[in-house]
Amino acid sequence: MIGILDYGVGNLKAFANVLKGLNFHHQIVKTEQELKGCEKIIMPGVGSFDSVMNKLIESGIRDVLSDLIINKKIPILGVCVGMQILASSSEEGSKSGLGWIRGRVKKFNFDRSDFSLTIPQIGWNEVNSTKENTLLKNLEKNPRFYFLHSYYIECEDKKDVIAIANYGGDFTCAVNRENIYGTQFHPEKSHHNGVALIRNFASL
């Protein structure tokens, strides 16, 4: 069963609709007992880094989530700020992240004389894989995904980076370390490429 983590933030129904269309057994989960029944977990996130971390802590499931991911090696997909909190820390706030992906979340910083670039980045952008990875298989060449963000992860270990995009310069937009996956873009809003990526994760 694929659990869509409900800790007060994130676009849960969109993921549920995609998984339903793909005929994967899924459930929106919010309790420790529900989490323990999951074979895979999707962790959406919308808002600021600190507010999302606070929601996760207040939900009372951070410890059981860590046990499932770090000790039992359950696959997890963090999306948008759900990916950012996989990192150790963020320029956006003072809270520590989960630290499962070593790195720091940074804000876009580029020449604002290019008026075509705004912060946040809102809209479609091309994603380029940096290595072969199961999460990104069977996508069209140079696939486009939907982004809505002002921050991105700068990974300490470049081996964790599986895809980049360009917005005033290259930035990490997808990561993977062992059973831990993350996308800065929103696959649930990205039509056929997003559906293919969610299918890849659900099929791990």
Curated annotation (Swiss-Prot):
Its main location: cytoplasm. Gene3D superfamilies: 3.40.50.880. GO terms for molecular function: glutaminase activity; imidazoleglycerol-phosphate synthase activity; lyase activity. Residues 1-204 form the Glutamine amidotransferase type-1 domain. It holds the Pfam family GATase. InterPro entries: Class_I_gatase-like, GATASE, Imidazole-glycPsynth_HisH. Keywords: Amino-acid biosynthesis, Cytoplasm, Glutamine amidotransferase, Histidine biosynthesis, Hydrolase, Lyase. GO terms for cellular component: cytoplasm. PROSITE patterns: GATASE_TYPE_1 (PS51273). HAMAP family: HisH. IGPS catalyzes the conversion of PRFAR and glutamine to IGP, AICAR and glutamate. The HisH subunit catalyzes the hydrolysis of glutamine to glutamate and ammonia as part of the synthesis of IGP and AICAR. The resulting ammonia molecule is channeled to the active site of HisF. Heterodimer of HisH and HisF. This is Imidazole glycerol phosphate synthase subunit HisH.
